[in-house]
Design a protein with these regions (language model features):
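NTP-dependent nucleotidyl-transfer catalytic core
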Residues: 1-140
Length: 140
């Protein structure tokens, strides 16, 4: 199998071990997903199925950004709690992926489950002088 390596900007042989792990950015669940989303997940699905056909175990992680400016804005517009909006859109997304018969993700970590870690990381980069605060936000 050969894959395009963006770091090398070339198609290179891909010779994985028995377990192949993958990560793909998931949705920010504030509105219906579209075909562009499906195309991404279809690509990962085809790759996983090919690897499985070749005898590899695959684990694909796809995050869910369940707290975000767009999600908070849309929830305010609709007069609902942002987590309720997210839950409904995630359910619609899952239904769409199932209708396309795509493999489910091995894990779907949510941004809200990592808030403490994110705050710790931000504190660390600020303490080390690798970030700065401006207008209530931190940049690095």
């Amino acid at each position: 199998m050969r894959l395009y390596d963006t770091a090398r900007r070339a198609v290179v042989p891909f010779e994985p071990g028995p377990l192949v792990t993958m990560y793909t950015c998931g949705i920010t669940p504030y509105d219906a997903t579209h075909f562009g989303h499906a195309a991404t997940y279809l690509t990962y699905d085809v790759l996983q199925r090919r690897l499985r056909d070749r005898g590899h175990e695959t684990r694909c992680v796809r995050n869910i950004t369940d707290v975000d400016d767009d999600l908070l804005r849309k929830a305010r517009e609709l007069g609902v709690h942002y987590l309720d909006l997210a839950a409904g859109e995630i359910a619609r997304f899952d239904d769409d992926m199932e209708a396309l018969e795509l493999l489910p993700s091995w894990s779907e970590p949510r941004a809200t489950s990592a808030i403490a870690d994110i705050r710790g990381f931000i504190g660390m980069v600020l303490d080390r002088g690798h970030a700065y605060e401006s207008g209530g936000s931190v940049y690095f």
